[in-house]
Amino acid sequence: MLHRIVALVLVLAPTVAEAQLCEGQSAAISADGRAFGHLPYGDAPESELVTLPSEYSVGNPCVVRADMLPDLLRLFAAAQGDPSVMGQLRALSCQRSIARQRSVFCRGETSSAADRAISVAPPGYSEHSTGYALDFAVRPANGCPDAEACMAATPAARWLRLNAPRFGFEQSFPGGNKQHVKWEPWHWRWVGASGSARGAAKARFVFSRARRLYPADPGVVPLVVKFSAPPPLPTPVAPPPSRSKKKRR
């Protein structure tokens, strides 16, 4: 009888969902679906990906969503024409498939998964897999390694904060974010400058949960149309009744 009760308790007990990371490693998934603070994302369809011209990237070829490419090229052109940037912005890391993310995340298995997740999102939990996110680099680097906090002090990074939202880009992980993800001033995602921009609705749907629960900073502010009420029409005033003159008899 006791064995039956124990078995029943085990069946009815709530199971803890886990994300499979590396071989023999897993991570508990929180109630809101996050693993080590990161939200889940799927792979971008290959048919929707294009390669950024090589002159705008460093290292491996940069692959992004086709809908995002025009705004990214306009951003690079604007930065290149602004002397305040004092350098050149380049794409460092763009779309990464879940399989590629797994190889990146698991290559440092000497440390714990929790420690690695501070700087690298677990496979299946990276914005890079969507094709809408990228890491920027500055050239010349002037002693600041790529993907390090020192980038925030560069003129190019300051230019990004002031101007990137005009091109539909927002900083996913600002300092002190409630998502408890490492501050990444180099990491930006595209959601379109307006909801009517081509492909923006799809991108905003992909990031809808992140944008609602953990707002970007700077973020792309949604357009709010305000209508001013027309001035009230004057109330017509009835003319005073005319006094009829009495006729003399």
Task: Give the residues covered by each predicted segment.
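N-terminal signal peptide c-region/cleavage motif recognized by signal peptidases
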Residues: 12-16
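Sec-dependent signal peptide recognition
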Residues: 1-8
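Extracytoplasmic cell-surface/polysaccharide-interacting catalytic and binding patches
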Residues: 17-94, 98-249
